[in-house]
Amino acid sequence: MAEDGPQKQQLEMPLVLDQDLTQQMRLRVESLKQRGEKKQDGEKLIRPAESVYRLDFIQQQKLQFDHWNVVLDKPGKVTITGTSQNWTPDLTNLMTRQLLDPAAIFWRKEDSDAMDWNEADALEFGERLSDLAKIRKVMYFLITFGEGVEPANLKASVVFNQL
């Protein structure tokens, strides 16, 4: 098949586990339990199967989403939810209204090496990242691990075309 024009240069940006931020959110949950207090109205408390990841936009302008590159090294499922939070967790807690829809869900079945995903939602979410990159240097994600996988089993990145 003939090429439609010059090949676009691609830029792959990894989602990186933010261990400090994840730990800080876990300490918030523990602190509330120890003091017998309730969360703020609308606050999102991190669950044991969730971790915070970040994407540092190496380049902010002229990016067009191409695809997600998500690999699980064993069967299981991950849900990647973006946040509108510009994080200063020592000053502000994550609120449920800051979780972006739709989430991207990726899974690997027991009898397969191939990854499956909710294609329409993952594509829509990815396209939003191109817009968010224009106004952000960092994007935070809440990743929920299910069906026996954990952060050590995940490699995830977003691939953009450079315009």
Swiss-Prot record:
It is found in: Cytoplasm. May act as a modulator of the olfactory signal-transduction cascade. Belongs to the olfactory marker protein family. Keywords: Acetylation, Cytoplasm, Olfaction, Sensory transduction. Pfam families: Olfactory_mark (PF06554). It comes from Mus musculus. GO terms for biological process: neurogenesis; sensory perception of smell; signal transduction. Interacts with BEX1 and BEX2. PANTHER family: OLFACTORY MARKER PROTEIN (PTHR15357:SF0). Uniquely associated with mature olfactory receptor neurons. This is Olfactory marker protein. The modification N-acetylalanine is found at residue 2. GO terms for cellular component: axon; cytoplasm; cytosol; neuronal cell body; nucleus. SUPFAM superfamilies: Olfactory marker protein. Its main location: cytoplasm. The keyword Cytoplasm applies.
